[in-house]
From Swiss-Prot:
GO terms for molecular function: mRNA binding; structural constituent of ribosome. Keywords: Ribonucleoprotein, Ribosomal protein. GO terms for biological process: translation. Homodimer. Part of the ribosomal stalk of the 50S ribosomal subunit. Forms a multimeric L10(L12)X complex, where L10 forms an elongated spine to which 2 to 4 L12 dimers bind in a sequential fashion. Binds GTP-bound translation factors. It comes from Mesomycoplasma hyopneumoniae (strain 7448). Pfam families: Ribosomal_L12, Ribosomal_L12_N. Belongs to the bacterial ribosomal protein bL12 family. Forms part of the ribosomal stalk which helps the ribosome interact with GTP-bound translation factors. Is thus essential for accurate translation. GO terms for cellular component: cytosolic large ribosomal subunit. This is Large ribosomal subunit protein bL12.
Amino acid sequence: MAKITKEQFIESLKEMTIKEVMELVDALKEEFGVDPSAVAVAATPVATEEVKTEVKLTLKAAGQQKVAVIKVVKDLLGLSLMDAKKLVDAAPSVLKEAIKPEEAEEYKAKLVAAGAEVSID
């Protein structure tokens, strides 16, 4: 029997009727003992981690440099000095909710540089 190429095989499939293709599939199952449904289940991609579009920035603690943290909170959130101090003193406290992850990372970097302990949820 002459060996055929993949392209020739595909061209032959294109010329077949649905019934002929079904018969071919059944014959392949029988010949090789393969169950296509088992392969399809195994080929199903694993669920990917959900990407968050909005996060919450929380100040956990002000750290040793409380004054520096108060200044950063004041500048980032546009608060008065007293409001920023109250927010920092009340730690752990939510600084911003429903913000983009990139923005939260930027805020976190500035707060950590000032000595704060921050989390993004």
